[in-house]
Amino acid sequence: MKSFKLNRVRYQNIMSVGGNPIDIQLDKVQKTLITGKNGGGKSTMLEAITFGLFGKPFRDVKKGQIINSTNKKELLVELWMEFDDKKYFIKRGQKPNIFEISVDGVRLDESASSRDFQEEFERSIGMSYASFKQIVVLGTAGYTPFMALSTPARRKLVEDLLEVGTLAEMDKINKSQVRELNSQGQVLDAKKDGVIQQIKIYNENIERQKKLSGDNVARLQNMYDDLAKEARSLKAEIEEANERLLNIVLDEDPTEAFNKIGQEAFLIKSKIDSYNKVIKMYHDGGTCPTCASQLHQGDPIVSKITDKLHECNHSFEQLTCHRDNLSVLVDEYRANVKTKQDLASDIRTKKQAMIATIDKAKKVKAAIEQASAEFIDHADEIALLQKELDKIIKTKSDIVLEKYHRGIITDMLKDSGIKGAIIKKYVPLFNKQINHYLKIMEADYVFSIDEEFNESIKSRGREEFSYASFSQGEKARIDIALLFTWRDIAEKVSGVRINTLIMDEVMDSATDSEGIKAISTILNSLTDANVFIISHRDHDPQAYGQHLQMSKVGRFTVMTVS
């Protein structure tokens, strides 16, 4: 029988332990008592072993919180153990991170990720974190009694113990294969659609060739004649538009002369306004704002300015008349320009339409020539494609059949399938062992669980009741009975003897003196095991092979062996 045995642990800078390491030989005696005051570090060994094996704290704290709060670095756990006649050395630390494993003195390859490396290690020693906390350790911190677990968690634990986890792996592989079959089926469907489409194209081509023969040629010829007529009509319209375009002769653009006369008229108008302003000043009298001389209506200069004003008015009238004449010419010029632009645009549009019509006529002509050509037979191509299609359909049928078979496997691998059958087979053994240990602890009731891990507790002459209705002491009896039952089952199923048991403050809880005596009886029967009792109660040291006392010196825990 294989053996899971912890030999030695050395740890430093973890919890209250500082840089001076604590070194414990774990397989030295059958029973070891570990005592100390609260906060003295008596449970730190358990944290160190758990971290060494699984890289996790035993209690429900973050990994970084177990580093010694004073030194804050160089947490290191070294663990020596045996499994299946192989000697393991595990070295694990934080700040810096360290994770090394040696088997029989040979260091294992760490090329995989730390998570994969850890999973492979747990498989190799036949122990998971959850199993360790249920069958190696019974404690008040970080330990959840089996009866306090959820139904899925209870099932998972028992499945691990019965080693039916392989079925879960098979289920994963099976589901992966189903997904792969679905993917292959989708690819085949796409291929099938492609082949069917190719066959369809060939058949359509044959039909198209048939349609292009006979009356179809005449229809195409009519289309060609209509397109040719349309092209000739467009050509005639283009020629007519070109002729009209050539007949439009543009004279010199009068816009510049029109604008120049406008500017001259504006200047003369400005002079007229200026003369009128000066005449008004002399008419109103007063003082000249420029030279300060006296202004009066009879000044001779008024007559001269009046003459100039008449000349400007005459010139302005002539320019206005000329400007009006030029405005007519400008409008005519612009109208001719627009007409030419419209004709040019119309010519371009009709040329494009004519080109498109000619292109259509060419295509129809090509279709006529194709219809008149020799008929092309695609029988060989269609035969090859049909053969390929038959092969695809056969492969798809095989996939559908395999999916059906894998569906059956899926049903078998469900909780109600093979796993359920295995669990059903072991339930009577579970109940037998549980009640065996309860009898040793002088319990006056019968405890049983069903295939769904629901408990049933009966006592002679009393009503049926539940785990939750018990006192803490009775719950402790049941928890301990379950612990030893799971250890027994794990050993029977795996063929692995678990040589280590750690009980953390179990005897300090609600268990009474009779319960403690019963537990001691069970522990004394484990002659091949190394049992560690962690307690802050008074115990008889003579009942133990060694006594490890943990105490604080300053801020750090030290160990005294007696």
Swiss-Prot record:
GO terms for molecular function: ATP binding; ATP hydrolysis activity; exonuclease activity. GO terms for biological process: double-strand break repair. The keyword DNA repair applies. It comes from the Viruses. The keyword Hydrolase applies. ATP binds at G36, K37, N38, G39, G40, G41, K42, S43. InterPro entries: P-loop_NTPase, Rad50/SbcC_AAA. Keywords: ATP-binding, DNA damage, DNA repair, Exonuclease, Hydrolase, Nuclease, Nucleotide-binding. To phage T5 protein D13 and to yeast RAD52. This is Exonuclease subunit 2.
